[in-house]
Amino acid sequence: MNRKNTGLYRLLGAISLCLFSVGICAETSIAILDFELSDVTLAPGIPAEIARTASIKAMLEGELKGAGYKIVTVDLAAQREANGGFGYLFNHNDVAAELANKAGADYVLVGRLHKPSFLFAYLMGHLIKTHDGGLIENYVVETKGGDKKLTLKAVETLASKIDKNLDNIYTPPPPIRTLHTK
């Protein structure tokens, strides 16, 4: 009888381990909506700033995908249809959550590049649970100037902040050092 119990315990232990392993291996899925530009400088709508804003989504997807997150694509036409105007999805977590939930994402990030000055801008984002529309965190990352390297650094910082609220698996790349020769 003792041997039967030992075998049963081993079997239950193996099943538990398998179920636990499946839970650990499940990827956290996140949808990242297109970032919108809130340019309140004296010369809004500069093509370079529009291009920079458009590049943020792809950079952030690359950082999070490299860390092991599953990136879910939301149909652009569906995103435009759900967006009632500038700032609508950013201010309506429930609508953004429903949009990403239909695409199969666990979470959605709604982002904005807020540019109050030519000297700096703020990368802003709302991380939302798609199953209930609950706001997990509101992020703000400052970036100086419009240089692509500085924008990427801000995106890396944003990815790190998002990851701290989710799986804590992201490791940002080390800073690039340049050697000065005499």
Model features per residue range: what roles?
Residues 26-40, 58-59, 63-70, 98-102, ...:
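C-terminal/domain-edge helix-coil "capping" segments
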Residues 67-110:
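Short, solvent-exposed, polar/charged sequence segments at loop or secondary-structure edges
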Residues 51-57:
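Well-ordered, non-membrane alpha-helical segments in soluble/globular domains
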Residues 41-51, 83-87:
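Second-shell loop/turn segments in exported
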Residues 45-47, 123-126:
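Short, glycine/charged-enriched secondary-structure capping and boundary segments
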Residues 2-12:
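Bacterial N-terminal signal peptides that target proteins for export
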Residues 20-22:
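N-terminal signal peptide c-region/cleavage motif recognized by signal peptidases
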